[in-house]
Amino acid sequence: MLCWGYSSFGQPGIGSNLQVIVPEPQVYGFIHDRNVKEVACGGNHSVFLLEDGEVYTCGLNTKGQLGHDYEGSKPEQIGALAGQHIVHVACGESHSVALSDQGQLFSWGAGSDGQLGLTTIEDAVTVPRLIKKLNQQTILQVSCGNWHCLALAADGQFFTWGQNSYGQLGLGKECPSQASPQRVKSLDGIPLAQVAAGGAHSFALSLSGAVFGWGKNSSGQLGLSDERDRESPCHVKLLRSQKVVYISCGEEHTAVLTKSGGVFTFGAGSCGQLGHDSMNDEVNPRRVLELMGSEVSQIACGRHHTLAFVPSSGMIYAFGCGTRGQLGTGHTCNVKCPSPVKGHWAAHNGQLSGKPDACKYHIVKHIFSGGDQTFVLCSKYENSLPADDFRTINETRYTCLINDETIDVWRQKLLEKNSSNSVNNVVQILSSAACWNGSFLEKKIDEHFKTSPKIPGIDLNSTRVLFEKLMNSQHSILLDQILKSFESFLIPQLSSSPPDVEAMRIYLILPEFPPFQDSKYYITLTLPLAMAILRLDTNPSKVLDNWWSQVCPRYFLRLVDLYKGAVVYLLSGRKTLLIPVLFSSYITAALRLLEKLHKVNQKVKHVEYDKFYIPEISSLVDIQEDYLMWFLHQAGMAGIVNNVASDLKMLLCKRRQCGVLARGLNQDSRDVGSIPGSSSNLLGDLG
């Protein structure tokens, strides 16, 4: 491992005999024969996670941020975490957080702003404690700002806590700081790939590259074209088409990495940390032109500096504040354009074999930065491994997806019932719109990155295949749980105002589930879904219309037939089994949804118009009676409808009887016209 930067408190762990400022990479191996997996840097402390799950810390310890009683440059193990297998660590200015392989979070250090999430406000916590508020969640990611934290759960729920002076918690206006994790409901339904915290600003990244930012924006670090703080997540529209796959935040600047290896930066630029050959702030995302000839695979931001790794050459480039040696260029001055970090670097597949000086070269594995320090995991040529690629999302770190592999695992968990937590986790994921929305992405030529009000970005064929697999008898226990989850949680919780188009894919996915076509589930699934669709606000409703116009005719016809079937089902005797208000709401929902589909079909001609016919209606509904009842309502006579209803029915019955008698006697049309109650006299009788 190599490290460089500011070490006045020993936080880089290089040793007390070295200078306060380390301006170029120094080899560092604090634990021989032990592999470091991750490094997190706080304001003046560092946390090291080993491959075996142990955690070591060093640096300043005034608030207990090291989790043990020692202080200084020598890393010491946190004994309180020895019984846990830690898989991820993060640091704030003076606090630390660790994530276990069981999805539990532990925090310690400064807590005066609630940043530890322990419910109580404490100035300093010297021993790691479990964040109990998240005990029912399986946490996958955690990120720390200076005095706040963000956490992403497996079911897509997103939590924040700590200081909220600038709205960095995303909980809305006038919300005070929070000492316990709070759910950010405004991102519900969006399948998230990453959460990232800056000094006092926050970001969330969706699986399809949508970027949402909020919090402090005094330097334009949210990329929203202004310098106004935001209290709730806001879509960074200028990045929507860039296929963003990773975000890193400094104190007041932000860097994003695209799938093609491009780097965009925005926010504070006073130290050159944006890499635009200037010291100006940028309120809009702007590509780092100096890196355009290279494909970048890793980025990392410190307090006021930025790093980028180019795998083809093995080089690390740095720019921004260098007064504390944090750029590793060998100098202590600010740099406003990407500059090579000093050292012997080589690509993983570089041609070093046989060279006499091959042992001098370092092969980068992973770069880390924070505060005024930088760490690089690397290896010698003969033992080198490919560098990590931040553009390849680690599936264990983002919103859980439903696929062949996961349904087999969940089926086994439900069969064993060895833990109520295991069952609860399955239920949470199956009930999550975010999990379903991210599960069937159209990955062919990255089509899902084009998700928009006109393009859903999902592969409905893969949806159908997975659902058909679930219908096999071997998955019956899981199927039962899915049905319960849809009925009790997922459909009732669908919002009338989804936060983004990515949260709307669920409306295309659910009708593909075979039980929706089964009349046994019309009341519990099919019709509630129709009601949820009809509750959508104007804009999301138009988005769904656009998406329906893009689907294949076969899918569209199934949807039409589904709700035609629901209408027939309701009219076939269900009126007497349901209370009137329920029957009325269900039949109205089915018919209005068919009307909505018909309007779409008029524009795109998915199916012939006669596919909307419901022939059974003529035998299930007395059209004449129904029409006259409707006519009276329309004429403003609703108040007397009930009084005349029985007379109306008697007259209609009388007309039918007389009509039958007339036909039996083979009377001519003139005689039929004179029969009391016939159509020519009906309005007169009513008068």
Go through each PLM region and give its residues.
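Conserved loop/turn at the beginning of each blade in beta-propeller domains
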Residues: 18, 32, 40, 82, ...
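Conserved core positions of repeat-based scaffolds
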Residues: 3, 45-48, 57, 95-98, ...
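Loop/turn-rich, solvent-exposed surfaces of beta-rich toroidal or solenoidal domains
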Residues: 251-253, 268, 294, 299-313, ...
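Short glycine/serine- and acidic-residue-enriched loop/turn motifs that recur at repeat junctions
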Residues: 2-22, 56, 60-74, 106, ...
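Blade-level signature of beta-propeller repeat domains, shared across WD40, Kelch, NHL, RCC1
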Residues: 315, 321, 331-346, 351-398
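Extended low-complexity, proline/serine/acidic/glycine-rich cytosolic segments
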Residues: 386-656, 687
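Conserved beta-strand position repeated across blades of beta-propeller domains
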Residues: 40, 48, 79, 90, ...
